């Protein structure tokens, strides 16, 4: 653990995510003192010029509650978006004033999961963040709550933070919350202890992780944080999950929170968003042979292996690949429009090319555009 923590302290490019409960008062409004305390840590951590930090910050909806006369976070999307519209400006204004104490400029970046799943948007977001860092500005990222629909919302900023960490090729992801790590039981119960290190999913197989956030102003609990940590770790990025009051220790490599070891290698950007940020526009049901070929042998999906098609999608859209029981086994970018596929079902590419033309002698989903969901 000591060696891993040393590597954490030496990380150069870091994504830090802070949740609503770490930025708000007991009544749910934005707490200027807590914002200042976080900014103190972040500004000092990057003051030597050796670290670049991107902040993924919740709090827009929470910041908009009091000005709109709302006592608690609304459940309906329209009022959440109204609160975010008012609160996002207040949130960034608070950060701008706080960072100004260190003569640091703030840059606002608002994203939706749609931005992460469209290649051009994804590429532009990456360039913007890189340029902000190169120019010495401090990027503050949030979900664009005012335009996100139910279908394309992240639902929490934890998953967004994991994807941003991958997007900017971060050396470390730090998830700050109101709990100082993952525990082997309910943290409020005597006798439970903090889990210092998670080497892989099996380490948490017998741990019951609660689902609700403490303060009632955010959407994420420990479940979403652990899931985000797993996404980042699977993409080769180490993660520290701890409380906001221990942020300085986390950034310096101190023994705080729960450390998630990287479990995989860095994958292509688009495959990570394909698995975790894309919204499938339809599905293809495969026969048993095609499921084995795609999942076990990692081959491309050919027309011969398709049993049925559902949904309305265009070539290039993400679709789910399902087995005969309806279980999603993979996700991929389809090479045909939905209306073209019925005439291809169960047929060989050679026959299709002979009958319909050479452009039909291709895979329905190429193996380079596939991610396996259930091996």
Language model feature labels by segment:
Residues 1-105, 109-375:
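C-terminal catalytic "cap/lid" subdomain
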């Amino acid at each position: 653990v000591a060696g891993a923590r040393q590597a954490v302290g030496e990380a150069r490019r870091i994504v830090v995510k802070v949740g609503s409960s770490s930025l708000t008062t007991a009544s749910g409004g934005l707490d200027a003192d807590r914002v200042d305390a976080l900014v103190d840590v972040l500004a000092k951590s990057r003051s030597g010029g050796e670290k670049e930090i991107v902040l993924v910050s919740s709090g827009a909806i929470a910041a908009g509650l009091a000005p709109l006369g709302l006592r608690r976070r609304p459940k309906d999307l329209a009022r959440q978006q109204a609160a975010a519209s008012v609160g996002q400006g207040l949130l960034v204004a608070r950060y701008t004033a706080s960072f100004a104490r260190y003569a640091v400029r703030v840059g606002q970046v608002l994203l939706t999961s749609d931005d992460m799943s469209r290649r051009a948007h994804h590429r532009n977001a990456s360039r913007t963040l890189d340029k902000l860092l190169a120019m010495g500005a401090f990027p503050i990222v949030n979900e664009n709550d005012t335009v996100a629909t139910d279908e394309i919302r992240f639902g929490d900023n934890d998953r967004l933070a994991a994807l941003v960490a991958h997007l900017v090729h971060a050396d470390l992801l730090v998830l700050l919350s109101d709990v100082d790590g993952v525990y082997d039981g309910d943290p409020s119960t005597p006798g439970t202890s903090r889990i210092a290190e998670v080497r892989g999913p099996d380490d948490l197989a017998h741990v019951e992780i609660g689902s609700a956030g403490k303060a009632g102003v955010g959407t994420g609990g420990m479940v979403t944080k652990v899931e985000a940590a797993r996404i980042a770790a699977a993409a080769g990025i180490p993660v520290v999950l701890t409380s906001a009051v221990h942020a300085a220790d986390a950034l310096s490599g101190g023994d705080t929170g729960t450390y998630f070891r990287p479990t995989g290698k860095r994958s292509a950007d688009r495959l990570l968003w394909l698995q975790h940020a894309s919204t499938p526009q339809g599905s293809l049901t495969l026969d048993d042979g095609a499921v084995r070929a795609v999942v076990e042998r990692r081959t491309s999906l050919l027309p011969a292996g398709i049993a049925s098609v559902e949904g309305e999608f265009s070539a290039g859209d993400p679709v789910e690949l399902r087995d005969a029981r309806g279980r999603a086994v993979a996700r991929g970018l389809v090479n045909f429009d939905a209306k073209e596929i019925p005439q291809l079902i169960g047929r060989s590419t050679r026959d299709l090319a002979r009958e319909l033309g050479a452009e039909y002698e291709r895979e329905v989903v190429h193996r380079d555009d596939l991610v396996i969901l259930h091996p």
